[in-house]
Amino acid sequence: AGVATCESLVRRWGGRRAEEGDGLVQVGGHLTEHVTFILPRLPLVRSGEPSHGTVWLSLDTDDICHLPSKSGHPTRSKRPEHDDTYRMSEKLASAWKAFLRWRDGAGKGIPVTLFVVAEQLDDPRFADHLRQLLDSDSAVTIASHGNRHRCWSAWPADPFGLQTDLSLSLRRLAEFAGDSFRPWFRAPGGYAAPWMAAPLAAAGVSLDSSVNPSWLTRRKAGPNRNWTSVSEAVRSEGLVERQWLTAHSLPVTGPALRIPLLSILARHSWKRATKGMSCASEMTLMSPEQPVDSLYWHLLDHARRGASWSPPLHPTLESA
């Protein structure tokens, strides 16, 4: 496993670093450095234990400057690449306040994962909001949405660049979020390709949630425009793939929540998927044989409707 994954497990299950086990090991016919961690206790998993959780909620924290029309995309962006220091927009600041109100109200106690762009930690206001959330809300987990929100599959394949970028984001987020961190990944902009699976595994990612299996979005799935190939590549590397919910092969998560016509289908699909259901436990989420409906939105959505917007969850949805 990657170092970020190991450190996350060690913190969670009371393990420790075991330098006495370090050394060289043979991997793929080559000697490589090996570091050791020990987990003295592990969660008890009963064989055949039923799983009642069927819904996983998450949101992406990317800002206006991260839109593919602004940056990160080789042809769509006004500035495909830049070195500007991130500063949070006033719209996202407003969305943060609305999201925190939702967490204190209708969203209280409901597990949710925030996929954070690591460079956002450079802005003191963003970091303060995230710290406030983590200190007051134990139902929140943090995962990676990349370091600078680069639309990777829109560019020529760059495994080394992706692994480097992702390793940096995982390390920064793990240091900031502590026990709330999870080594999970969502591709910025939903741009994912089969070649990305190996760098994800090498960086220590254990779960990917980048696949939007709709014909409308297949241009984002690499040169072959095939979401099945992306999912198979991810699973072949030993990662769990949690693809986004669709309806009639149409997207119903993320941007679909605000796109005319699609938004009607999206709201209906969310209500149906969450009616009388409960949120998936982490054990269920990490068990690839267990079906889970993955629903996600954007933090910026909370700035809509005069900062009164909230995800269209059915009121009967229960926490794990």
Where are these regions (language model features)?
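Alpha-helix boundary/capping motif
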Residues: 20-27, 34
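Active-site-adjacent pocket scaffolds in enzyme catalytic domains
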Residues: 35-46, 179, 186-294
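Active-site beta->alpha N-cap acidic-glycine motif
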Residues: 37-135, 307-316
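Short loop/turn segments at strand-loop or loop-helix junctions that form parts
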Residues: 57-72, 117, 144-149, 243-247, ...
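Metal-dependent polysaccharide deacetylase catalytic core of the NodB/CE4 family, i.e.
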Residues: 109-195, 211, 217, 294-297
